[in-house]
């Protein structure tokens, strides 16, 4: 995934997340079509860095905001599920980085990664987005979007420096 954030000024947090999610799914599909092994691994590593930025930013901004207004035990368990989901995706990236692209196991694990990412997207869109809409007004959602963009930009810069 390109670490360069999409320019969507004034967008609320849900739109910023939708854009990130769409880019992840599209770029993961592209990894499947690259036939050169080195390019496949390079694309996968770029996507992994983008995922790391997205996940950390989502945890710092969105989950923290929801935890601040959701003090119930069940919502705490759901937050734990989301953190675990992020860890599963990262673990799958670990496994893929040790495999030869386009071999049977690599493709199988790539399919699992796609399923995990799709589950993450669906959970965000169908569970978290409605909760955000219930708990925050338009101005607050826009502010969360700005906080997300700022945090994402900072983490992106750090990831780029680490990769250089």
Regions found by a protein language model. Give the residues of each.
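Small-residue-biased structural context
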Residues: 1-164
């Amino acid at each position: 995934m390109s670490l360069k954030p999409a320019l969507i000024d004034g967008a609320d947090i849900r739109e910023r997340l939708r854009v990130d999610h769409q880019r992840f799914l599209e770029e993961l599909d592209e990894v499947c079509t690259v036939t050169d092994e080195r390019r496949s691994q390079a694309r996968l590593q770029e996507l992994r860095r983008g995922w790391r930025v997205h996940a950390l930013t989502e945890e710092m901004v969105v989950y923290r905001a929801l935890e601040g207004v959701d003090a119930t035990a069940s919502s705490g368990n759901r937050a734990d599920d989301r953190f675990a989901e992020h860890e599963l995706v990262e673990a799958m990236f670990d496994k893929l980085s040790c495999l030869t692209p386009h071999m049977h196991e690599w493709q199988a694990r790539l399919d699992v990664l796609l399923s995990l990412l799709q589950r993450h997207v669906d959970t965000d869109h169908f569970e978290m987005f409605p909760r955000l809409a219930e708990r925050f007004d338009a101005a607050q959602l826009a502010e969360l979007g700005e906080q997300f963009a700022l945090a994402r930009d900072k983490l992106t810069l750090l990831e780029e420096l680490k990769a250089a």
